[in-house]
Regions:
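N-terminal carbohydrate-binding/catalytic regions of secreted carbohydrate-active enzymes
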Residues: 1-6, 10
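Eukaryote-skewed repeat-based solenoidal scaffolds used as protein-protein interaction platforms
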Residues: 11-161
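CBM-like carbohydrate-recognition segments
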Residues: 155-173
Length: 173
């Protein structure tokens, strides 16, 4: 572990204290870069909090954990900046990092199985709302939102099949 428990708590408090992933959600560029990497920090905090082999297992304050879970669940439904790589900033990757975060949210032991339908709603809306084709590895990271919870027993394949049957995805030839 590269952090002490004190540092872990400090990072969790700081990253969630000023609006979190909702901060400047309507702005792009540097604001997106900050949100994107904040999403990665959220994902790592939740991963450590959920990992029974980690010294940080269940170490997040319950209030902060709930903020991370709730903001992580809804982040991709709010993010608009689809920049993958920027010549000015490097990798911005908000949708890839947001997908990594959503995967950690769904797989976290404190995320109830009966809320999986919200994840399906968010993904369905995302596929309808985003007009571009992702080309910077966002696709497989979005796929992880579905297959990691299946592998961890948080989601049944039948649930995914039922959801796919109900969604009218726009398909381009």
């Amino acid at each position: 572990e590269l952090f002490t428990q004190e540092q872990f708590h400090f990072i969790a408090e700081e990253v969630s204290s000023d609006g979190g992933l909702d901060k400047e959600i309507d702005k792009v560029g540097l604001s997106t870069l900050e949100r994107s990497f904040r999403a990665l920090i959220y994902a790592n905090l939740l991963s450590a909090d959920a990992n029974q082999q980690s010294i940080f297992y269940q170490e997040l304050n319950a209030g902060i954990r709930n903020v991370l879970l709730n903001q992580g669940l809804h982040y991709l439904s709010k993010e608009k900046d689809t920049t993958g790589f920027s010549s000015q900033y490097g990798w911005v990757h908000a949708f890839a990092h947001g997908s990594d975060l959503l995967t950690e949210v769904v797989c976290h032991p404190d995320f109830p199985k009966n809320r999986v339908h919200e994840v399906f709603d968010i993904l369905g809306q995302l596929f309808k709302r985003i007009a571009i084709r992702f080309t910077d590895d966002e696709d497989w990271r979005l796929a992880r939102v579905i297959y990691e919870p299946i592998l961890q027993g948080k989601l049944e394949q039948e649930q995914v099949a039922s959801w796919i049957k109900t969604v009218d995805f726009p398909i381009e030839e």
